[in-house]
Curated annotation (Swiss-Prot):
Subunit composition and interactions: Homodimer.
EC number: 1.11.1.-
Single Gene Ontology MF annotation: peroxidase activity
Location in the cell: Cytoplasm
Name of the protein in question: Hydroperoxide reductase
Alphabetized SUPFAM superfamilies for the sequence: OsmC-like
Length: 141
């Protein structure tokens, strides 16, 4: 079964954007931080990646016998604002997981690898670009 996604984005008079999906909406804004009304588009993309990774981990943990007491993720990305090769996209994404769990380090690392392969956002970004995605895990017992 194919899952479909439908998002409508509207440019507002103040140059912010409103994205609408189902009954939800989010304000995005590419202007400088001191005037912005929401995340920039790339920050929203990275937030979506983090949310997908966390949701996938939460869903898959019971089946993999992983106990999650607390789960956090920090995502950073980098791109050139004046590229010599004409590529303006993200060149690297770093995912830092912090997992509070009694499971072993080996179990957690295998689980995160499993999650990354099943997260649709991670798969999409990894599969269609030359983007390097680094994954780092901190286990807290």
């Amino acid at each position: 079964m194919d899952k479909k996604y439908d998002i409508t984005a509207v440019l507002n008079e103040d140059s912010s954007m409103t994205a609408i999906s189902d009954q939800f909406q989010i304000t995005l804004d590419a202007r400088p931080k001191h005037t912005a009304k929401g995340f920039g588009p790339l920050a929203a993309l990275l937030s979506g990646l983090a949310a997908c990774e966390l949701a996938t981990a939460n869903l898959m943990a019971p089946a993999k016998m992983i106990t999650i007491n607390k789960l956090l993720m920090n995502v950073t990305g980098s791109r050139s604002t004046n590229p010599t090769d004409g590529y303006f996209g993200l060149r690297e994404i770093n995912l830092h997981w912090e997992i509070h769990s009694p499971n072993s380090e080996t179990e957690i690392k295998e689980f995160i690898d499993f999650v990354s392969k099943r997260c649709p956002a991670h798969n999409t970004l990894q599969g269609v670009s030359q983007l390097k995605i680094n994954v780092n895990v901190t286990l807290v017992h």
